[in-house]
Amino acid sequence: MPGDKVKIALLLAAALAGPVMAGELGVLKPIIKDNDALMRERPDGKGKAFVLEQVRQGKLYEALQQEARSGFTRTMLALDDLAMQVAGDPKGQTSWLMLALEDGGFARCGFWLQDGGKQRWLNECMVDLVVDQDSIADGSFEEIYAHEIGHVFLRRLLPNLPQGYSRTPHHSFSVTDQQTALDEGFATHFQAIARRFTHNQRLLAQDAGAEYKPYTPLWLSNLDRAYRIEGVRQNWFVHQQIAPPGAEDAIVRRELSTMFDRAQLKNPAQMLASEGFDATVFYRYAAVGEGGAELVRRYEPLFRALKALNAQKLATDTSLVPALAQALSGLSRADGDRFVQVLMDTSYGALASPQLAARAEALALTGRMGDGDAFVPALKAVRKEMAEQAAAAQARPAMLAEHIGPALWLLHPTLKALGGGQNDAPLAINLNTAEREHLMALPGIDAARADRLLASRQQSGSFASIDDFLQRAALSAGDAQAIRGMEGAMRAAGPYPRD
């Protein structure tokens, strides 16, 4: 709407005229009853929501307000204010933070606010996070809050984002589905942005490797946090993972692998189902330049594009990041061209051209062997082809989705996602992102047949349908029927809701 554009232009002009403007950080805490957080039925009848009261004093409250005034959180609050403006909120809402008692780290929408003896429903979003003085002092609050409020931005701008079908617990190095990858990747990139622009000396020391602890970095969640930063900076997630040796479940070892083969690329479907890859794209788009008000300004076209994407009919097979590139190009050709260039650079051109992907892999093989005679001329040739393909993609961003293929989901009748260790959901397999270990879990597929299917997918393109997969697999009638049964089971189960 023209009026909305004028309001946002005035907001940005005011921000750029001085220090970054930020909204209020409202602090909430749960009402405790019988040693547990009080919950009450939502007005729409869809489950329960927290009953909360506002915090307005105390040492922790003051430390949070100081962070909101002078830390990087100030910039995130300004971005939340921008997200509200772009989403069309005429009055502006408070950026709410709920002080979780345990197991925090969520973006939630809707809660009961108790004021005096009365409770009223607020259909507003909040970050649910465990916070203490130490987490504020060492910068971990600043970083994790940036991640969680990134989810809030998407709830405001892209509320129609569909749920995905993957049941795999998400990590920066996991391959799930495009919906989860966009949601988590967008939030994750703000952690790297927080590291880029923080002034917290302890977080800077940790980032530089000057503040550290032995042993605890080896824990899964700490590995994940580290890869959300370094993996994004080094563009690791575009590469194929290597399953480490071990006696543990083969699929689990593959999905939790933190080892990447820098001479092998993921296929386009795997890239866009990787939150680490999406995080890298968003980070590279936003990180170049000054922080503060300039950073807020850089996000405005992207926020507009997310809102435009929300107006489209989004489905399971919508290639979300390429669709976002199209939306951004439609609003601003210059910003769209820059986003497409980031996509091309980050994917080594694989999203637009399988030939470019193959040339990048060949170049990597000669490069890591130090073969200058082969590397230098190949580099010159591949750069020329990349420039041509990038120009073509900028002129027609839809081509970035042409090599992804459909999402062909199967629900395994007995195996659990990640072996059932972190959740009890059945294993879901997308045939166009599946690796050797996943295929070998299917009826009639041994190691040799799995390798042939992967080679066929790489050489002849993504599987166009279940029928196409079964034809290439050449399975017995009984095994083919079992796989069709797994397809039907997934249709019956439907998408997988995540917190």
What are these regions (language model features)?
Residues A17-P19:
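N-terminal signal peptide c-region/cleavage motif recognized by signal peptidases
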Residues E62-V130, D134-D138, E142:
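Auxiliary, metal-adjacent structural segments of Zn-dependent hydrolase domains
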Residues H412, K416-G420, L470-D499:
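Alpha-helical interaction/regulatory segments in DNA maintenance proteins
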Residues R449, L454-I466:
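Residue-level signature of tetratricopeptide-repeat
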